Regions:
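Charged helix-capping and loop-helix junction motifs
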Residues: 143-145
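A short alpha->loop->secondary-structure connector
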Residues: 116-123, 148-149, 174-177
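Structured helix-beta-strand junction loops
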Residues: 33, 153-154
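Nucleotide-state-sensitive switch-loop elements of NTP-binding domains
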Residues: 2-10, 17, 21-140
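A short, aliphatic-rich alpha-helical micro-motif
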Residues: 90, 148-151
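G-domain G4 guanine-recognition motif of GTPases
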Residues: 99-100, 131-135, 154-175
Length: 177
């Protein structure tokens, strides 16, 4: 499809940790270039999609289930469609960000990107960024295996809610990580 591989970043994190807030900041910074965003929602209402402020970037919302499990077959097709539209100059972007639901494990998404022949030829996994809530992070790690997986596979962990967390909460959570 393309001579230049398109970087893909997986943005994951705990439920309510602030993934969409971070994504909005990235999209509003013009230094980041044009970004195609794939927003995945678990359930029928795309709440995060409504929270994403309007931007000039293309947002693809897939609502048929958890990105990492039930719609893995749709992810390659969605990315391929984006790449084709980019090649045809129907849309213009330099990178793709996949924002997962807080229930997603990034491993299967990463595996899809690396093992699908078309995706492996046209994209490169740029990294996995996990947003972790400094206030509730330890409890979330205790309660949800998906959160442990999100932290374990992260290239970068961003602590959110540090402005409302107690210094001891932040220190304890950082030590645990």
């Amino acid at each position: 499809m393309n001579d230049t591989k398109i970087p893909i970043t997986i943005l994951t994190g705990f439920l309510g940790a602030g993934k969409t807030t971070l994504l909005n900041k990235v999209l509003s910074n013009t230094k980041n270039g044009r970004v195609a965003v794939i927003v995945n929602e678990f359930g029928e209402k795309g709440l995060d999609h409504h929270l994403i402020e309007q931007s000039t970037d293309d947002v693809v919302l897939m609502q048929s289930g958890c990105l990492c499990c039930s719609i893995r077959g749709d992810l390659p097709k969605t990315i391929e469609r984006l790449i084709l539209k980019n090649i045809r100059n129907e849309i213009n972007f330099e990178r793709i960000v996949i924002e997962t639901t807080g229930l997603a494990e990034p491993g299967p998404i990463m595996q899809t990107l690396l093992l699908d022949n078309v995706l492996a030829s046209n994209t490169q996994l740029d990294g996995i960024i996990t947003v972790a809530d400094a206030v509730n992070g330890s409890q979330t790690l205790d309660a949800q295996f998906e959160a442990v997986s999100q932290i374990a596979l992260a290239d970068l962990v961003i602590l959110s809610k540090t402005d409302i967390a107690l210094p001891k909460q932040i220190q304890d959570f950082e030590n645990r990580l």
